[in-house]
Amino acid sequence: VTNLSGDLAKVFLKINKKYGTDTIVLGSDITQTGGRITSGSLTLDVALGGGWPTNQWHELIGESTNGKTAIALKTIAANQKRDPEFTTVWVAAEEWVPSYAEMCGVDSARVYVVSTNIMEEAYEAVIEIVESKAIDCIVIDSLPALVPSAEDDKEMEEATVGRGALLTNKFFRKVGKASKRSLVTPERPFIGLIINQWRSKVGVMYGDPRTTPGGLGK
């Protein structure tokens, strides 16, 4: 921040020194407003306003076998064709099927697969990968398949309440910080895709009975 003097300049300089040089900038200096990445579908791109907004997380939600994974794969395939350096990380909490990916046009040799369904492991890996600013796309497939370690260690009859919701909310707070990119300095953008499924709430008489795994924990 330039052209300032007095107490305000001292405060801004102190904050930028403590939290990073781009923490406070002039509005007129902002040039990196975030772009968009094609979904591989013209119709979906139009609905999204030009494609997936970068440096953000997007939830692909629907019933089972409704094409959520296909949308993620088509997004990867379209951008691999556009950019030879396009790099993807796929968190395979369920599975990674090379033959299906290739049928959707994906070059599997340019996709790195994280094979775990333990929630803490997956979330920590994703946060570190996003912080690296070295990838273009990261997909979590899927949220319902992730299991908190506390639940994984228990027997079927033992209850665990709210652990997944708490971890998921903590993850989004931390990955939100990791997803932040400079407003004035060019940095590699990315998109995050999370695949989720509808579930039905028991005993709902009015309103939409649908809900999603993830919960409302804080």
Describe the residue ranges of each PLM region.
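Phosphate-binding/switch region of NTP-binding enzymes
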Residues: 2, 129, 161-218
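The Walker A/P-loop phosphate-binding site
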Residues: 2-110, 123-131
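Walker B beta-strand of ABC/ABC-like P-loop ATPase nucleotide-binding domains
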Residues: 138-139
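N-terminal cationic and glycine-rich segments that engage phosphates or anionic surfaces
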Residues: 12-13, 145, 151, 200-205
